[in-house]
């Protein structure tokens, strides 16, 4: 074993853990709405996400953001109150769900004719 007298620096690196809580899904505005509403969401890292509208029975009404890759950032999407067939939905309560990986966030909105 030979001693060279050289030293090396050890560094501690911060590890950033991203949790589902770091993903933000804001309350839509306006709410109640007619004819359109805006939904804002924030991604802390690049993610594959989708946003879907459901009725109170849990049936899919519309997909307002098909599955896609998005870089980190804050985004807005609008829903015009139309179902996936292009028909105006009935007045009432609906839920919008953002899916990212194995996680979901859901909020409630109200459409009024």
Protein language model annotation of sequence segments:
Residues 11-29, 33-54, 63-66, 76-79, ...:
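Glycine-centered coil/turn sites that cap beta-strands in beta-rich domains
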Residues 1-3, 10-14, 87-113:
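C-terminal tail/sorting-segment detector
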Residues 36, 48, 72-74, 91, ...:
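Short secondary-structure junction motifs
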Residues 65-101:
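Short, surface-exposed loop/turn motifs with a glycine/proline- and acidic-biased composition
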Residues 53-55, 111-112:
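Residue-level detection of beta-strand scaffold positions
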Residues 6, 39, 61-63, 105:
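Terminal low-complexity, poorly structured segments
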């Amino acid at each position: 074993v030979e001693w060279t007298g050289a030293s090396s620096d050890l560094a501690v690196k911060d590890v950033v853990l991203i949790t589902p809580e770091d993903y933000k899904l804001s309350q839509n505005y306006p709410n109640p709405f007619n004819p359109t509403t805006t939904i804002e969401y924030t991604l802390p890292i690049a993610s594959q996400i989708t946003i879907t509208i459901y009725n109170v029975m849990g049936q899919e009404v519309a997909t307002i953001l098909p599955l896609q890759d998005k870089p980190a950032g804050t985004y807005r999407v609008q829903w015009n109150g139309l179902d996936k067939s292009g028909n105006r939905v009935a007045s009432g309560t609906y839920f919008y769900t953002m899916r990212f990986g194995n996680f979901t966030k859901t909020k409630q909105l109200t459409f009024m004719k």
